[in-house]
């Protein structure tokens, strides 16, 4: 039986590469799109008919929970985010809802409805602030200096908290 993966944010650059990779490895892939996104998704058009496409929104717990209940994925990848640091200053509430609280909605949906699933939460170097990338490692202190980096720091820490608690 094929492994099942749920990719939240499948139409993003990284999400589409991941969907390609997992499909090639024989996974049954479900990728999400937001209803408010463009009607064309050039990054994943070549996968239409090969992967399942569902609508979900990180602002809406029920849309995520519905997919976890329906597909019972072995692996859940949250690639979605408001991922432009400069824009995070103009949209701090939206950035926090999508990039900080949205991942908690994913974690909670998995905890409540399919706790066997493994969760991958995408992160960014922005959690480290103005550090030189060559000098960073797993022990480097978080020092985010914009709303996007702070939101992703929260998501990272909540993912660790859920992993250690559940």
Please state what every model-predicted region is.
Residues 1-166:
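N-terminal Rossmann-like NAD(P)+-binding domain of SDR-like oxidoreductases, especially those catalyzing
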